[in-house]
């Protein structure tokens, strides 16, 4: 109910812009490798399905992103339809990022610990979603997900939920890691 006005206004703006469907749907991986269809507001032109699938290379200034899409990404509004995934039980509010299926195998080869992300249900928000941005490397996002999993507590989830709201008001909320340190817990190294 709280986000209804934002959801409705965004859907209307996307429909009036006429750049294709309102929603972007894609298969993603979650707990135990289960697959679900994530729902997001469309931020890219719908002209070429292959280009749409290549969202990893989408960066600031990418010509595939619509003008409305730039605004939605800047303030992370494109992520709000994932609340539907949460209500369906496919995602949790807080957890590791829901990864594209084609990237799970690739990232597991590059970062073997990546497979541990599937120990928890994917989340709408989490450490990687807050500290990592659209242009943060997959390896760094995986490390942030692992830090979250290793330090999971309900109080930590609550803290991350509160921090999520602050990204809507930060200008750098989508710019990736900079020179600043991550406000992250330390990873416990086990022998």
Predicted features and spans:
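Short, glycine-rich, amphipathic interfacial segments at transmembrane boundaries or analogous
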Residues: 24-64, 124-143
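Short, hydrophobic secondary-structure boundary micro-motifs
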Residues: 10, 24-25, 53, 94-96, ...
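Short beta-strand/loop motif that positions the catalytic acidic residue
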Residues: 146
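A short, structured surface patch at a secondary-structure boundary
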Residues: 58-121, 160-168
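A hydrophobic, helix-centered structural microdomain
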Residues: 1-47, 85, 154, 159-191
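Gly/Ser/Thr-rich helix-start
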Residues: 19-21, 34, 70, 90, ...
């Amino acid at each position: 109910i709280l986000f209804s006005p934002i959801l409705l206004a965004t859907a209307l703006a996307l429909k009036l812009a006429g750049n294709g469907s309102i929603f972007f749907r894609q298969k993603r991986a979650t707990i135990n490798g289960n697959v679900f269809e994530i729902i997001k507001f469309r931020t890219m032109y719908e002209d070429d399905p292959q280009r749409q699938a290549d969202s990893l290379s989408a960066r600031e200034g990418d010509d595939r992103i619509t003008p409305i899409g730039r605004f939605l990404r800047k303030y992370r509004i494109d992520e709000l339809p994932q609340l539907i995934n949460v209500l369906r039980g496919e995602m949790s509010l807080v957890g590791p990022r829901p990864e594209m299926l084609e990237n799970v195998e690739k990232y597991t080869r590059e970062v073997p610990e990546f497979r541990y992300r599937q120990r928890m249900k994917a989340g709408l928000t989490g450490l990687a979603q807050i500290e990592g941005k659209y242009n943060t490397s997959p390896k760094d996002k995986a490390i942030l997900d692992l830090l979250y999993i290793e330090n999971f507590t309900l109080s930590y989830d609550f803290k991350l939920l509160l921090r999520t709201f602050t990204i809507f008001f930060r200008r750098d909320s989508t710019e990736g890691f900079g020179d600043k340190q991550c406000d992250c817990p330390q990873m416990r190294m086990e022998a």
